[in-house]
Amino acid sequence: MAKVCYFTGRKTVSGNNRSHAMNQTKRTVKPNLQKVTILVDGKPKKVWASARALKSGKVERI
């Protein structure tokens, strides 16, 4: 299972670190994903959910 939010689709994105000399190195920015159990078709299923989805009430936990 990929680390992608089941509800919002948030996933890891890439960017750059910049030094004072403006040198660049690649970096990744990861979302705050939590593993939660939800009901899908009446059965419990463990999925990744972003903290934003949890706080906004998009997730109905069991």
UniProtKB/Swiss-Prot annotation:
GO terms for biological process: translation. It comes from Streptococcus pyogenes serotype M1. The gene is rpmB. Belongs to the bacterial ribosomal protein bL28 family. One of its GO terms (molecular function) is structural constituent of ribosome. Keywords: Ribonucleoprotein, Ribosomal protein. One of its GO terms (cellular component) is ribosome. This is Large ribosomal subunit protein bL28. It comes from the Bacteria. PANTHER family: 50S RIBOSOMAL PROTEIN L28 (PTHR39080), LARGE RIBOSOMAL SUBUNIT PROTEIN BL28A (PTHR39080:SF1).
